[in-house]
Amino acid sequence: MDELKKAASRFRELIVGTPKNSLPISLQDFPNGSCGDATLLLGQYLAEQGYGEFRYYLGWRGGKSHAWLQSGSVIVDITADQFEDFDDPVVVSDRSPWHDCFAGTGQHIARIDVFGEQAKAVLGSAYIAILNSPK
């Protein structure tokens, strides 16, 4: 799990280092309000790095939604620190009571092409910019 956390941390660093004008609006205030698209992009990245496919999980707590990756019991989240009650920038864990509070459900495989060609074009451009980030 240490290698998975390193990969997730690396991807987060790449997002942070990417010029904002190269990112869609949904990622320009990362991690705030970025969990949906960041989760799809991270799922794509981890699959390409050989970690297999993850599911996109979506949950609600107190009127706020949150998305993260999950494969079996393994949770991967690079945007949880957008919430005031969570400080860790990267979560890779077999269990997370914090995520349990969202009562998330698996929606679909986390890839940049799950929402059709238009979304794939936008997320694909962002993905290329992120991978080419100077950070």
Question: What spans do the regions from the language model cover?
Answer:
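A structural boundary/capping signal
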Residues: M1-K135
